[in-house]
Regions:
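Sec-dependent signal peptide recognition
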Residues: 2-7
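N-terminal signal peptide c-region/cleavage motif recognized by signal peptidases
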Residues: 13-15
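N-terminal secretory-pathway/extracellular module detecting exported/lumenal segments
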Residues: 19-103, 107-184
């Protein structure tokens, strides 16, 4: 009788384990399968640079104590497109005051970045560039900071520009900040 009961329990446990592994994993309301299908069928929308940024409206965000540059996003340029790309104007200011201005995109699901245009003297120069993987420890750490802390919580793009602006003002997206608090 005990052997029969042990076999039954083992069978039920095995069936339950098999059932759990077949359930789709869900991120941001989408299953892994849905995310993979979107990645395979993805098409980028046509992109044009926004109006040139104004210094007085820029929002600063922290990158690292290792850099002497200061980094800013123009809130007026921030968009979350129907193609799942968060686009924004980035300003990197050197200690001497020189500004590197770029119009960029983050593809959250793929963890990739792309530069659409370079800025200078109040105007944009379009740039043909490919999507590149965001490397957490690369020289260009600001991409990882914007990806991980502000615009791509849980690998999903922000839903609205206002959500991204609020994340910049708070020092991080609420979903990320809450997750960090729960890990402590």
């Amino acid at each position: 009788m005990r052997r029969l009961l042990a076999c039954l329990l083992a069978g039920v446990a095995g069936a339950a384990a098999a059932q759990n592994t077949n359930e789709p994993q869900v991120q941001g309301g989408k299953s892994d399968w849905e995310i993979e299908q979107e990645r395979l069928n993805w098409r980028e929308v046509d992109v044009r640079p926004p109006p040139y940024p104004k210094d007085e409206t820029l929002i600063e965000f922290r990158v690292s104590s290792d850099t002497r540059f200061r980094f800013f996003v123009d809130p007026a340029s921030l968009t979350s497109g129907p193609d799942g790309v968060v686009r924004f104007t980035l300003v990197a200011r050197s200690p001497s005051g020189y500004a590197n201005v770029t119009y960029e995109g983050l593809r959250c699901v793929a963890k990739e970045t792309k530069v659409y245009a370079l800025g200078g003297e109040g105007r944009w120069t379009a740039r043909e560039s490919a999507w590149r993987l965001i490397e957490p420890r690369s020289f260009q750490r600001w991409h990882n900071e914007l990806y991980a802390w502000y615009f791509c919580p849980n690998r999903m793009p922000i839903e609205t520009a206002a959500e991204g602006v609020e994340a910049l003002r708070r020092g991080g997206h609420p979903a990320v900040l809450i997750d960090m608090q729960n890990r402590r």
